[in-house]
């Protein structure tokens, strides 16, 4: 499902006080600074095997929200996984954790937001959960809802 991007500030103005705007401050690290799409989720801690498996599937213009527990100890996404996501049609990634290969990510046509960077690799045991509600920055990211992301922040709207 392709979602037309709308600036987050415009969405906030339209929705009003009930807006679901994420308070957590993410760094803009991908080459695409504006992205929107249906939400899919992964919860994993310092292990990116499940995340890579999900991004190996067709993304259909979706946004993968990754709850890495806020850990900056290891990177959950690097250039190889981001390219896999881009090639499979994902619009963007929102990572509550670290990424690496930031110079390469800036040159890729995919949205990537994360808390920070760390060159250290994660483990690859496959631990984690997918398609679960994830709450970050006062907002619950529910699979099937729509995430809008730009330089001003992230807004979540109810999906169809």
From Swiss-Prot:
Catalyzes the aldol cleavage of 4-hydroxy-4-methyl-2-oxoglutarate (HMG) into 2 molecules of pyruvate. Also contains a secondary oxaloacetate (OAA) decarboxylase activity due to the common pyruvate enolate transition state formed following C-C bond cleavage in the retro-aldol and decarboxylation reactions. GO terms for molecular function: 4-hydroxy-4-methyl-2-oxoglutarate aldolase activity; metal ion binding; oxaloacetate decarboxylase activity; ribonuclease inhibitor activity. NCBIfam families: NOT-MenG (TIGR01935), PRK09372.1 (NF006875). Divalent metal cation. Keywords: Lyase, Metal-binding. It is an enzyme of class 4 (lyase). Disulfide bonds: none annotated. Substrate binds at residues 78-81, 100. A divalent metal cation binds at residue 101. This is Putative 4-hydroxy-4-methyl-2-oxoglutarate aldolase. Its EC number is 4.1.3.17, 4.1.1.112. GO terms for biological process: regulation of RNA metabolic process. The keyword Metal-binding applies. Its cofactor is a divalent metal cation. Homotrimer. Belongs to the class II aldolase/RraA-like family. Pfam families: RraA-like (PF03737). It catalyses: 4-hydroxy-4-methyl-2-oxoglutarate = 2 pyruvate; oxaloacetate + H(+) = pyruvate + CO2.
